[in-house]
């Protein structure tokens, strides 16, 4: 298991299929199927974020940090979240993840990201990972493409799924 379906595979596939559909290229009919898969994966990702802002650390490329949530961020940016997931709960969940991971040691003395998952942990970096690879974590910022008055930004804070579930909420 790893997060490569979120880092690049599913997001890039939907982007390519979108262009294919726009230009009526053969195979573009797969767009609708893939879009439903992307939305389902975003739904699963939202539930993976614990009340504390942690999530399973698994697979390779752990140094990409919260870039693991590219699918959730992209589906939010596309405004295609499932009905039961509100944009504000995604905003709050992703913010909690970032606050949890951006601890002392995350940045070097010049302000560049250090290798690691939570702080400076070069030993977790795969041999193909460089300092530049760290910046795949910026995928989490895709919602910055939304307008400032978008519900994602303006709605009051809302608990995300695992917070509700672990508190015994029935909502």
Residues covered by each model-derived region:
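Long, repeat-rich segments with strong aromatic
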Residues: 2-115, 122-149
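Extended hydrophobic packing segments that form well-structured cores
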Residues: 142-171
């Amino acid at each position: 298991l790893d997060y490569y379906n979120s880092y690049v595979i599913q997001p890039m596939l939907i982007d390519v299929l979108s262009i294919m559909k726009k230009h009526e290229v053969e195979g573009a009919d797969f767009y609708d199927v893939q879009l439903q898969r992307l939305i389902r994966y975003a739904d699963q990702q939202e539930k993976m974020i614990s009340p504390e802002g942690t999530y399973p650390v698994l697979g390779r490329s752990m140094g990409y940090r919260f870039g693991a949530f590219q699918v959730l961020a992209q589906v939010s940016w596309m405004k295609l979240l499932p009905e039961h997931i509100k944009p504000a709960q995604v905003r709050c969940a992703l913010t909690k993840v970032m606050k949890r991971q951006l601890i002392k040691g995350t940045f070097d003395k010049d302000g560049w990201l250090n290798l690691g998952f939570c702080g400076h942990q070069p030993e977790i970096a795969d041999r193909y990972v460089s300092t530049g690879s760290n910046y795949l974590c910026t995928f989490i910022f895709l919602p910055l493409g939304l307008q400032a008055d978008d519900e994602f930004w303006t709605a009051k804070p809302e608990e995300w799924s695992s917070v509700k579930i672990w508190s015994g909420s029935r909502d």
